[in-house]
A protein has these predicted regions:
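Short coil/turn motifs at beta-sheet boundaries
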Residues: 38-40, 57, 109
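Terminal connector regions
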Residues: 99-153
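The feature marks short-to-medium sequence segments in extracytoplasmic or secretory-pathway proteins
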Residues: 55-100, 105
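Bacterial N-terminal signal peptides
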Residues: 5-14
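Low-complexity, acidic Ser/Thr/Pro/Gly-rich terminal tails and inter-domain linkers that flank the onset
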Residues: 19-48, 52, 148
Length: 153
């Protein structure tokens, strides 16, 4: 029996362990394809991610990189989980959006979609792409603002 325990222990040590995602979120799946619309051609990447941090996240920021035949990055774009897509809009102030509460936090273990694209006319030729999680800040409790007491009657 002791021999069996030693063998099982050795097998467990030798088995590859799946480490928790250090970034706090995991890309579950993604697909990319050329599309056209609004008079432009673009390579659209859509996918799903999961909050693996064990706590609520303010947002998940991802980087999609276009790769040439040698694996070199020829273009990149940053994007966010679906609930936080407004953070990527150039005309909006991300800090104000986050402080206003307009960006819904991503609960622990929740899954959500993401998307990003490359315009054909602005992107060098590429043969593949990759998606990486680059930011996963923890959601912080909102401050409670006390209102002054009204006049006593």
């Amino acid at each position: 029996m002791r021999w069996l325990a030693l063998v099982l222990g050795a097998l467990l040590l030798a088995a590859p362990a799946r480490a928790a995602d250090a970034a706090g979120a995991q890309v579950l799946e993604h697909k990319g394809r050329w599309e056209s619309g609004y008079g432009a051609q673009f390579y659209n990447v859509v996918g799903r991610l999961k909050n693996t941090s064990g706590h609520e996240l303010r947002y998940v920021k991802l980087r999609i990189e276009a790769l040439d035949e040698h694996g070199n990055v020829v273009a990149r774009t940053d994007t966010y989980n679906e609930s936080a897509e407004a953070l990527a809009v150039p005309d909006l102030n991300p800090r104000e959006l986050l402080e206003s509460g307009k960006v819904k936090p991503l609960p622990a273990d929740a899954e959500e979609r993401f998307r990003g694209s490359f315009l054909k006319e602005e992107t060098p030729a590429f043969t593949d792409y990759r998606v990486k999680v680059i930011e996963t800040p923890a959601a912080t409790p909102m401050k409670v603002i006390e209102t002054p007491a009204g006049p006593s009657e």
